[in-house]
């Protein structure tokens, strides 16, 4: 199916090439800026036909063959590299548009634009003076009588007013007093009472120990006396029994 399409493609390409060559020749003939236009103006002469034919032949020779197009081995990059680069674009015979090139900025202008304007320090001497000025202590003015039983203290970091309470006082304004159950005299009396109780208890214990010792000694002596009496009675009974046997 591809073989009948090749001659059609070739004929179409030839027609396109011929038309483009003819259009380019007409543009060059009508261009007023070129010197060749004056000599080739008017009707198409034989030389003009030869020029157009020569250009058509050159363009035909530059176009790839049908076999290269069918195989796809043709490199289009070489064709585009060989073409001369045009600085402008031709829209019409009487109008020609050229590329606009922006002027380059000087280095001095670029450096000036990059440099930022220096900011002026606000305040100057007055600003330094304001910083050096200390804030007023509110304890001397607003919170002078804030603490009832204590001293007012102002913490600058936290900006808080606190009270340093006196002894036995507490609370936010040191208005509450802690009530003690025992005084110092009571403490001394309690100590004396504890000492007296310990002495009394120790005396009772010693007395009990002494009484116990006395009772044990008395009981021991009594038991010993009873034991001696029993032994004497046994001796007497033995002696009496011995005399009775002797008489008998």
From Swiss-Prot:
Residues 29-48, 57-77, 100-136 are annotated as: Disordered. Residues 1-26 form the signal peptide. Its main location: membrane. InterPro entries: EGF-like_dom (IPR000742). It is found in: Membrane. Glycans are attached at residues 106, 241. Residues 117-136 have a biased composition (Basic residues). Residues 100-116 have a biased composition (Basic and acidic residues). Induction: Androgen-dependent. Keywords: Cytokine, Disulfide bond, EGF-like domain, Glycoprotein, Growth factor, Membrane, Signal, Transmembrane, Transmembrane helix. Disulfide bonds join 139-152, 147-163, 165-174. GO terms for cellular component: cell surface; cytoplasm; extracellular space; membrane; nucleus. Residues 58-70 have a biased composition (Polar residues). GO terms for molecular function: cytokine activity; epidermal growth factor receptor binding; growth factor activity; receptor ligand activity; transmembrane receptor protein tyrosine kinase activator activity. GO terms for biological process: dichotomous subdivision of terminal units involved in mammary gland duct morphogenesis; epidermal growth factor receptor signaling pathway; epithelial cell proliferation involved in mammary gland duct elongation; ERBB2-EGFR signaling pathway; G protein-coupled receptor signaling pathway; glial cell proliferation; mammary gland alveolus development; mammary gland branching involved in thelarche. The chain crosses the membrane at residues 192-215. It is a single-pass membrane protein. Ligand of the EGF receptor/EGFR. Autocrine growth factor as well as a mitogen for a broad range of target cells including astrocytes, Schwann cells and fibroblasts. Belongs to the amphiregulin family. The immature precursor interacts with CNIH. This is Amphiregulin. It comes from Mus musculus. The lineage of its organism: Eukaryota, Metazoa, Chordata, Craniata, Vertebrata.
């Amino acid at each position: 199916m591809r073989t009948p399409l090749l001659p059609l493609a070739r004929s179409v390409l030839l027609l396109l090439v011929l038309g483009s060559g003819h259009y380019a020749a007409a543009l060059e003939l009508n261009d007023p800026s070129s010197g060749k236009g004056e000599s080739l103006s008017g009707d198409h002469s034989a030389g003009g036909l030869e020029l157009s034919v020569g250009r058509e032949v050159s363009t035909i020779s530059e176009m790839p063959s049908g076999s290269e197009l069918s195989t796809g081995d043709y490199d289009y990059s070489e064709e585009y590299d060989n073409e001369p680069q045009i600085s402008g674009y031709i829209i019409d015979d009487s109008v020609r548009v050229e590329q606009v090139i922006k002027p380059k900025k000087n280095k001095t202008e670029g450096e000036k634009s990059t440099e930022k304007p220096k900011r002026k320090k606000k305040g100057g001497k007055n600003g330094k003076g304001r910083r050096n000025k200390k804030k007023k202590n509110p304890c001397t003015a607003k919170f002078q009588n804030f603490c009832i039983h204590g001293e007012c203290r102002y913490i600058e970091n936290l900006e808080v007013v606190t009270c340093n309470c006196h002894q036995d006082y507490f609370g936010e304004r040191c208005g509450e007093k802690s009530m003690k159950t025992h005084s110092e005299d009571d403490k001394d009396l309690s100590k004396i009472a504890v000492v007296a109780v310990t002495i009394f208890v120790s005396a009772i214990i010693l007395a009990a120990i002494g009484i116990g010792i006395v009772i044990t000694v008395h009981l021991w002596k009594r038991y010993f006396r009873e034991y001696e009496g029993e032994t004497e009675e046994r001796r007497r009974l033995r002696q009496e029994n011995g005399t009775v046997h002797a008489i008998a």
